[in-house]
């Protein structure tokens, strides 16, 4: 007789106890926790309004799923919501240890697979090798192209970004502990500061992660204090998300270039960072180091995972010259879970260690 313990089930709980059901995935090592059920309705006429509503009224959901004991300080999540855009198959709000992002490329790559496999888009016709999924992110509509076989996702996913552009180059910033440091700022659905790790006395491939995090965080705080971020479309998008340290190999080569992204509250991306690759391609194109449709490979110094990226066409974002960037990578499922929240648990809303 099969043991009752062999079949996973929820522990005894009161009928009114909140239950949060999720699917967990990762893209290049960076986790994505997708909420299937248990999140209250997120109100608002637009996706950005829904993002504000969730921050103000439902932030306990983020903390419960991202923080310990159910998550960890580097957990990443997605809440699926209806979109006001007629062409969108789904809308998404991105969750992290500090709050809510405007864009997440690794999540889009994972959500492309998820949307196809879980029936959020119409089943592709027989023989279709790639399905299209329109995902409304807070930064705008992003199209994912999902490799498929017999109607199921199979292999890598690629996406086309919102217009990506450069906000500033060769910006001198006074970084405590490092003196004057030259940084570039570019947008790939979120704004990043880019710095060659060597300028901070670090080797991107061999330095301790803690040292890279400390240096990148110092740059982020310095840029926030000394430079105003602006976005032509919305103030909701006008914030510095983090700093990406690179190996400085921005000139075109077929060899991978290595970087690490530190974002939000010192959160470390395990992947090469999809929106960061988008912004870095825009920066390289802006500097004349890259031509349209020249493919580059980007390697995570954290896990060694690789994304590819290329600028596919020119565009505009307000008065900024921009490019649409294609980013490719592969996401994998890791499991499902159902979490309960007991009223008498003093740590029910989560905690973080630093």
Curated annotation (Swiss-Prot):
Question: How does this protein assemble?
Answer: Homodimer.
Purpose of the protein: Catalyzes the dehydration of trans-3-hydroxy-L-proline to Delta(1)-pyrroline-2-carboxylate (Pyr2C). May be required to degrade trans-3-hydroxy-L-proline from the diet and originating from the degradation of proteins such as collagen-IV that contain it.
Q: What is its EC number?
A: 4.2.1.77
Q: Which UniProt keywords apply?
A: Lyase
Q: In which tissues is it expressed?
A: Ubiquitously expressed.
Q: Which residues bind substrate?
A: 105-106, 269, 274-275
> What is stated about pH in the biophysicochemical properties?
Optimum pH is 8.0.
- Alphabetized GO MF terms: hydro-lyase activity; trans-L-3-hydroxyproline dehydratase activity
Q: Name one Pfam family in it.
A: Pro_racemase
Q: Which organism is it from?
A: Homo sapiens (Human)
Instruction: Specify the protein name.
Output: Trans-3-hydroxy-L-proline dehydratase
Q: Which gene encodes it?
A: L3HYPDH
Q: What domain of life?
A: Eukaryota
**What miscellaneous comment appears in this entry?**
In contrast to the T.cruzi proline racemase enzyme, lacks the conserved Cys at position 273 which is replaced by a Thr residue, transforming the racemase activity into dehydratase activity.
